[in-house]
């Protein structure tokens, strides 16, 4: 019997899963994964930053915050033709979804028609579309949906009780409100967080509890491992134990059985062996390409070699004109180069 989809997880239940002996936790997570997905199929994603740097927020992990000296230069919003050129390249390389990220606290209303034109153009190429632009109003979310947007990324970042240690310029409720606007507009959600920012295991549990308690589980759950960037307040933080990261993947898979669980930022520093454990634990999505926002990502050749060694295949997707997934196929996220309001830690 397939694992039930629950929205009533309790903190002590998820904590008990985290605390299981490592082999037992992986066994349980792998079993849940196989109930809902082909374990040999992995969703492949890349990102294009359509507006880099200059963000007014103070997220302690983010090299795009203008208040930190990180060497990231602010750039204006890209022209639509330049974005579409990147989208064509992505499609030619086998992409099926193109994601556009902008380093904004929230887009201004005057920005929406420009982004909508990008979305419509990408959609016309036959690609799925996703975006991460910061906080959205309900009207903005509907405008993006009308333009052809399929997915919207907006992360919770961390547990509610640790959030104020990381961010002061945006409230947790602001994030929940944006997710509500996105769902109400009929968009699919991509929502996860970052680990390795000094939080406790109980707070990692709290992040997963917040995600699994949303009215609808996110379609994609990116689990980012902190990429320490010189100039940001979190540079020099203690490194997260690799097995703790795998535990995070495993409990995410058990708590949200039908969501795509994505290895996101931080994968560049992971060994092939660690990534293999993550796939065994239920990860079935990665970011692919040479850059992930403003931080590195494993070279494409390394990813292809790892897939070959493990016998993994990229997922395919077929989406109808209204953006609905067909049957057993799942998205193969696509984009191009670098940020959004996931900064170094992405969609």
Curated annotation (Swiss-Prot):
<comment type="pathway">
    <text>Cofactor biosynthesis; biotin biosynthesis; biotin from 7,8-diaminononanoate: step 2/2.</text>
</comment>
<dbReference type="GO" id="GO:0005506">
    <property type="term" value="F:iron ion binding"/>
</dbReference>
<dbReference type="GO" id="GO:0004076">
    <property type="term" value="F:biotin synthase activity"/>
</dbReference>
<dbReference type="InterPro" id="IPR024177">
    <property type="entry name" value="Biotin_synthase"/>
</dbReference>
<keyword id="KW-0808">Transferase</keyword>
<keyword id="KW-0001">2Fe-2S</keyword>
<keyword id="KW-0093">Biotin biosynthesis</keyword>
<keyword id="KW-0411">Iron-sulfur</keyword>
<dbReference type="InterPro" id="IPR006638">
    <property type="entry name" value="Elp3/MiaA/NifB-like_rSAM"/>
</dbReference>
<dbReference type="Pfam" id="PF06968">
    <property type="entry name" value="BATS"/>
</dbReference>
<keyword id="KW-0479">Metal-binding</keyword>
<dbReference type="InterPro" id="IPR013785">
    <property type="entry name" value="Aldolase_TIM"/>
</dbReference>
<dbReference type="GO" id="GO:0009102">
    <property type="term" value="P:biotin biosynthetic process"/>
</dbReference>
<feature type="binding site">
    <location>
        <position position="99"/>
    </location>
    <ligand>
        <name>[2Fe-2S] cluster</name>
    </ligand>
</feature>
<comment type="subunit">
    <text>Homodimer.</text>
</comment>
<feature type="binding site">
    <location>
        <position position="62"/>
    </location>
    <ligand>
        <name>[4Fe-4S] cluster</name>
    </ligand>
</feature>
<keyword id="KW-0004">4Fe-4S</keyword>
<comment type="similarity">
    <text>Belongs to the radical SAM superfamily. Biotin synthase family.</text>
</comment>
<dbReference type="InterPro" id="IPR007197">
    <property type="entry name" value="rSAM"/>
</dbReference>
<dbReference type="GO" id="GO:0051539">
    <property type="term" value="F:4 iron, 4 sulfur cluster binding"/>
</dbReference>
<feature type="binding site">
    <location>
        <position position="130"/>
    </location>
    <ligand>
        <name>[2Fe-2S] cluster</name>
    </ligand>
</feature>
<feature type="binding site">
    <location>
        <position position="190"/>
    </location>
    <ligand>
        <name>[2Fe-2S] cluster</name>
    </ligand>
</feature>
<comment type="function">
    <text>Catalyzes the conversion of dethiobiotin (DTB) to biotin by the insertion of a sulfur atom into dethiobiotin via a radical-based mechanism.</text>
</comment>
<feature type="binding site">
    <location>
        <position position="55"/>
    </location>
    <ligand>
        <name>[4Fe-4S] cluster</name>
    </ligand>
</feature>
<feature type="binding site">
    <location>
        <position position="59"/>
    </location>
    <ligand>
        <name>[4Fe-4S] cluster</name>
    </ligand>
</feature>
<protein>
    <recommendedName>
        <fullName>Biotin synthase</fullName>
        <ecNumber>2.8.1.6</ecNumber>
    </recommendedName>
</protein>
<dbReference type="Pfam" id="PF04055">
    <property type="entry name" value="Radical_SAM"/>
</dbReference>
<feature type="binding site">
    <location>
        <position position="262"/>
    </location>
    <ligand>
        <name>[2Fe-2S] cluster</name>
    </ligand>
</feature>
<keyword id="KW-0408">Iron</keyword>
<dbReference type="InterPro" id="IPR010722">
    <property type="entry name" value="BATS_dom"/>
</dbReference>
<feature type="domain" description="Radical SAM core">
    <location>
        <begin position="40"/>
        <end position="258"/>
    </location>
</feature>
<dbReference type="InterPro" id="IPR002684">
    <property type="entry name" value="Biotin_synth/BioAB"/>
</dbReference>
<keyword id="KW-0949">S-adenosyl-L-methionine</keyword>
<dbReference type="GO" id="GO:0051537">
    <property type="term" value="F:2 iron, 2 sulfur cluster binding"/>
</dbReference>
């Amino acid at each position: 019997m397939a694992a039930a989809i629950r929205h009533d997880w309790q903190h002590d239940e998820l904590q008990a899963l985290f605390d299981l002996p490592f082999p037992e936790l992986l066994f349980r997570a792998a079993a849940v994964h196989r109930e809902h997905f082909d374990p040999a199929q992995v969703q492949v994603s890349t990102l294009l930053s359509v507006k880099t740097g200059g963000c007014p927020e103070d997220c302690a992990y983010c090299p795009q915050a203008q208040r930190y000296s990180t060497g990231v230069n602010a750039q204006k919003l890209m022209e639509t033709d330049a974005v579409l050129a990147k989208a064509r390249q992505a499609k030619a390389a086998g992409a099926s979804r193109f994601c556009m990220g902008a380093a904004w606290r929230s887009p201004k209303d005057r920005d929406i028609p420009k982004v909508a034109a990008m979305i419509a153009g990408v959609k016309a190429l036959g690609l799925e579309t996703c975006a991460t632009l910061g906080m959205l109003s309900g009207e903005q979310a509907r405008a993006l949906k009308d333009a052809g947007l399929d997915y919207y990324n907006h992360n919770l970042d961390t547990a509610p009780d640790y959030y104020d240690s990381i961010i002061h310029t945006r409230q947790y409720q602001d994030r929940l409100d944006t997710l509500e606007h996105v769902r109400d507009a009929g968009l699919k959600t991509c929502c996860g967080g970052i680990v390795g920012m000094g939080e406790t295991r109980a707070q990692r549990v709290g992040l997963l509890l917040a995600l699994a308690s949303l009215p609808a589980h996110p379609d994609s759950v990116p689990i980012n491992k902190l990429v320490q960037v010189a100039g940001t307040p979190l540079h020099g933080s203690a490194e997260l134990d690799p097995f703790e990261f795998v535990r995070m993947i495993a409990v995410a898979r058990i708590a949200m059985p039908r969501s795509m669980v994505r290895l996101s930022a931080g994968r560049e520093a992971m060994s092939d062996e660690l990534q293999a454990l993550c796939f065994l634990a239920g990860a079935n999505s990665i970011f692919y390409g040479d850059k992930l926002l403003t931080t590195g990502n494993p070279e494409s050749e390394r990813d292809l070699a790892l897939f070959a060694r493990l016998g993994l295949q990229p997922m395919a997707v077929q989406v109808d004109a209204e953006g609905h997934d067909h049957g057993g196929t799942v998205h193969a996220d696509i984009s191009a180069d670098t940020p959004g309001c996931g900064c170094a830690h992405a969609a």
